[in-house]
């Protein structure tokens, strides 16, 4: 069943009729080994190893794939695996602008959904061929049970050959990637797998939430970050930083582990001081770009109004959060995955709300940030940008081949 059609997919290019603004045509996918008659899926399981490289070589200009940070494995991958049935039951409404994008694509288009979740957009345009992937095995199982063409894969390492799809979408995915390099890499992957002239739609949570009260329900990651991921030997854990009430976290330093060092043995958390520094992140790991002197000097200001204004500015600069997911006690999975999560400390009980509470990691995007990342992708251009339902959204078009 799953992906059988892809193993024998013709390399012939189809001439498709144009229907609307997004006029595209199909390409090809490289071979993928997936057992269609069993429960096995293509996987990059972090339980087995840090990452599984399944992509073919591509342009040297692409950002290098980093080792999956511990924060993503624990507070994204494991959380969504645990809450998958409940999460899926709450995800059925389709965003009108995403639907409009998909419906504008011509008949016969191959559409790749990177981070498809429960597959609510797969098959939205019945005249197109959809393939979804997600890092969560349970969510992919939900899609597979509905007969959708899906596989387990990482957004920063998509398992498709170059120029395979006619279009790609990434809906509410990039904000779960914890470093700028990984977010940029995910964009590069989306562009890589669509053919020249193809389109990519990306949506991310915005720092500028329409309902600002939501921010009060989220946990800023600064204190948690220092406590669990930085480690005692880092300048980030100095008394000046630790006791600074104005400390905010705009980004998480990049971690880079060589393929020979991808295993972190018996470690619950990665201490950044023990990981080789990448060139881009040296200053961040030393705390220089995360806590500029202008922030530290706020505590020395005498004028109370100035301090309040500075504090408000710092709150606005906060972009790293834990966002709670409340899983009701009556849900069946509470006795399964959630029991294990409670025992391991991944989740906590909230008897007042009658729920098991998980924290999901989010990097919320400030205005212009998504465009800045996308503009660094050399072979694509931004053709549309908009703000929708507290999300920043862009449409990219991959450069068409020169017609000589």
UniProtKB/Swiss-Prot annotation:
Keywords: Methyltransferase, Phosphoprotein, S-adenosyl-L-methionine, Transferase
Transmembrane regions: none
GO molecular function: S-adenosylmethionine-dependent methyltransferase activity; tRNA (5-carboxymethyluridine(34)-5-O)-methyltransferase activity; tRNA methyltransferase activity
Chain positions found as Phosphoserine: 238
Pfam families per record: Methyltransf_11
EC number: 2.1.1.229
Matches recorded under InterPro entries: AlkB_tRNA_MeTrf/Diox, Methyltransf_11, SAM-dependent_MTases_sf
One annotated Gene Ontology cellular component of this protein: nucleus
Broadest EC class assigned to this enzyme: transferase
GO biological process: methylation; tRNA wobble uridine modification
Catalysed reaction, written as an equation: 5-(carboxymethyl)uridine(34) in tRNA + S-adenosyl-L-methionine = 5-(2-methoxy-2-oxoethyl)uridine(34) in tRNA + S-adenosyl-L-homocysteine
UniProt xrefs under PANTHER family: ALKYLATED DNA REPAIR PROTEIN ALKB HOMOLOG 8 (PTHR13069:SF21)
Function field: Catalyzes the methylation of 5-carboxymethyl uridine to 5-methylcarboxymethyl uridine at the wobble position of the anticodon loop in tRNA via its methyltransferase domain. Catalyzes the last step in the formation of 5-methylcarboxymethyl uridine at the wobble position of the anticodon loop in target tRNA.
Subunit comment: Interacts with TRM112A and TRM112B.
Protein name from the UniProt record: tRNA (carboxymethyluridine(34)-5-O)-methyltransferase
């Amino acid at each position: 069943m799953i992906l059988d059609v892809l193993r024998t997919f013709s390399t012939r290019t189809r001439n498709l009729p144009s229907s609307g603004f997004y006029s595209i045509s199909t390409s090809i996918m490289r071979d993928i080994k997936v057992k269609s008659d069993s429960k096995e899926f293509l996987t990059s399981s972090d339980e087995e190893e840090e990452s599984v490289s399944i992509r073919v070589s591509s342009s040297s200009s692409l950002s290098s794939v980093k080792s999956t940070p511990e924060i993503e494995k624990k507070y994204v991958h494991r959380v969504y695996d645990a809450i998958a049935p409940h999460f899926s039951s709450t995800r059925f409404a389709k965003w009108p602008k995403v639907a409009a994008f998909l419906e504008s694509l011509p008949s016969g288009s191959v559409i790749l959904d990177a981070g498809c979740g429960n597959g609510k957009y797969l098959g939205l345009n019945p005249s197109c061929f959809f393939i979804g992937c997600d890092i969560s095995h349970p969510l992919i199982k939900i899609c597979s049970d509905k007969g959708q063409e899906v596989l387990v894969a990482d957004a920063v390492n998509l398992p498709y050959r170059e120029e395979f799809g006619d279009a790609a979408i990434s809906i509410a995915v990039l904000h779960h990637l914890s470093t700028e390099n990984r977010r940029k890499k995910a964009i590069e992957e989306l562009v890589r797998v669509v053919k020249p002239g193809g389109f990519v739609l990306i949506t991310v949570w915005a720092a500028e939430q329409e309902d600002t009260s939501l921010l009060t329900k989220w946990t800023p990651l600064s204190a948690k970050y220092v406590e669990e991921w930085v480690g005692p030997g880092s300048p980030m854990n100095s008394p000046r930083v630790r006791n600074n009430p104005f400390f905010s976290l705009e980004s998480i330093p990049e971690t880079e582990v060589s393929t020979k060092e991808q295993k972190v043995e018996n470690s619950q958390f990665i201490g950044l001081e023990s990981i080789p520094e990448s060139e881009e992140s040296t200053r961040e790991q030393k705390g220089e770009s995360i806590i500029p002197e202008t922030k530290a000097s706020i505590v020395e200001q005498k004028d109370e109004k100035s301090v309040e204004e500075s504090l408000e500015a710092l709150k606005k600069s906060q972009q790293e959060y834990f966002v709670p997911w409340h899983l009701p006690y009556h849900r069946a999975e509470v006795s399964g995955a959630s029991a294990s999560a409670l025992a391991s400390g991944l989740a906590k009980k909230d008897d007042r709300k009658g729920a098991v509470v998980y924290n999901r990691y989010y990097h919320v995007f400030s205005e212009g940030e998504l465009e800045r990342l996308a503009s660094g992708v050399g072979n694509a251009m931004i053709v549309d940008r908009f703000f929708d339902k507290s999300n920043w959204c862009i449409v990219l078009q991959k450069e068409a081949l020169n017609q000589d």
